[in-house]
């Protein structure tokens, strides 16, 4: 599958999702550090050999892609990415020209959380809608992608681990769980450095309003009620994307069940 020139071997950070009719979508990080997809319409027996890049060319570094699908062609993908194109070719953490690999990212690279939607991912020329979701970086500098080669830069850069994920509920609403390494003064801009980007705070974004991944549901609206928790435990922000809004819940484990 996806054996065109842009595909690394072995693939990195791969993930597969299936829709309600068993069409399959395989995602991975390509050799140019973009997120790529290969599709199967026969339950994974055969795959198309030409992959599709689903992350914008402006995102020059990406890692940890995760995906879920609803009805045929309706998918959402999340990943960490950077648009710091000026850092390409500059010395990485090993002093070599940086090629966009997040594992070797220099200190002037910031990684944000992105989400990419498609409602026609099975079409010959599918349309993808992408938005940078997080208002501040998730990580600054390098992200350890090889547990045998992590670096101590103000603490281990393995702080994010690799436990990000994306799921949908019975209404087709998207939820994104991720580890946030840049919090406090790192997020506020007062000290946005790799050394201050070593948190591991669990956070969740979910779709506030926009199209469900189940066609019969139509457009989703925001929940009628906000979880009854102290303000200091929950920070909620509506962030625009082309046809939907995402909401962030910080410290989700503190949310009480009703």
Language-model features, listed with the residues they occupy:
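Extracellular, repeat-based ectodomains that mediate carbohydrate processing or recognition
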Residues: 1-224
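Intrinsically disordered, low-complexity sequence elements enriched in Ser/Thr/Gly/Pro
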Residues: 37, 196-198, 230, 252-255
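Juxtamembrane/start-of-transmembrane alpha-helix segments at the extracytoplasmic/lumenal side
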Residues: 226-240
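A cross-kingdom C-terminal cell-surface attachment/processing module
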Residues: 237-255
């Amino acid at each position: 599958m996806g054996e065109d020139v842009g595909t690394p071997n072995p693939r990195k950070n791969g993930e597969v999702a299936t829709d309600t009719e068993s069409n399959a979508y395989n995602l991975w990080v390509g050799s140019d550090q973009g997120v790529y997809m290969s599709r199967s319409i026969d339950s994974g027996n055969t795959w198309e050999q030409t992959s599709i890049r689903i992350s914008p060319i402006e995102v020059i570094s990406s890692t940890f892609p995760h995906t879920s699908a609803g009805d045929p062609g309706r998918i959402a993908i999340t990943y960490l990415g950077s648009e710091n194109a000026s850092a390409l070719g500059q010395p990485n953490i090993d002093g070599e020209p940086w090629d966009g690999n997040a594992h070797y990212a220099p200190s002037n690279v910031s990684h944000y959380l992105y989400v990419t939607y498609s409602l026609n991912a099975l079409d010959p020329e599918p349309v993808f809608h992408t938005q940078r979701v997080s208002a501040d970086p998730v990580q600054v500098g390098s992200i350890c992608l090889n547990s045998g080669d992590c670096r101590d830069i103000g603490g281990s850069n393995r702080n994010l681990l690799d436990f990000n994920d994306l799921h949908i509920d019975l209404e087709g609403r998207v939820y994104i769980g991720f580890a946030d390494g840049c919090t406090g003064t790192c997020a506020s801009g007062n000290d946005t450095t790799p050394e201050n980007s070593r948190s591991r705070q669990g956070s969740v974004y979910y779709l506030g309003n926009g199209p469900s991944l189940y066609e019969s549901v139509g457009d989703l609206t925001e929940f009628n009620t906000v979880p009854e928790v102290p303000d200091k435990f929950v920070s909620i922000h509506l962030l625009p994307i082309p046809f939907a809004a995402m909401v962030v819940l910080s410290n989700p484990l503190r949310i009480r069940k009703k």
